[in-house]
Amino acid sequence: MNLSYLVACGLMITLLSVRMGAKPLSQAQQKSFRSLLGEELAEFLESEEKERRLDAVRSRLRLLRDLRMDTRARGVWARLLNDQPVPRRHKTGIKKGGSSRSGCFGHKMDRIGTISGMGC
C-alpha cells in the first residue's frame, strides 16, 4: 500500500519536473511558414513578437520598481534601527500640583500604578 503511494508520488514528481517547451523556428522555417499562412497571419506573428518585446520591457520596469521599493524599505529599517536618540518635545504648560496625580518623573501614572501603589 505504501509502495503504491511512493510510486505515485515519484511519478507525479517526474511528470512535474519534465518541461514542455517550444523550440523557436529557424529563419528558413519562418519564411516558408509565412508564405503558407499569408500576410494576415504573418502580421499576427509579428505582433506576437512585439508583444514579447513589450513584455520584456514591462518585466524590466517591474524589476526596477521592485528595486526602488526595496531601497525604500531598507531606508525605513535604517531609520527604525538608528541608534541616535530622538530629541523629545516636552509639553510646556501649567502643571497641577499634588503627588497623587503625578507618578514617575512628573508624568501622570496609569490606572494600575495608582491603584496598586506599585508605581515610583
Curated annotation (Swiss-Prot):
It is found in: Secreted. Its main location: secreted. Residues 23-96 form a propeptide. Residues 1-22 form the signal peptide. GO terms for cellular component: extracellular region. Keywords: Cleavage on pair of basic residues, Disulfide bond, Hormone, Secreted, Signal, Vasoactive. GO terms for molecular function: hormone activity. The keyword Ion transport does not apply. Disulfide bonds join C104-C120. One of its GO terms (biological process) is receptor guanylyl cyclase signaling pathway. Belongs to the natriuretic peptide family. PANTHER family: C-TYPE NATRIURETIC PEPTIDE. Exhibits natriuretic and vasodepressant activity. Has cGMP-stimulating activity. May help to regulate body fluid homeostasis in a variety of aquatic environments. This is C-type natriuretic peptide 4.
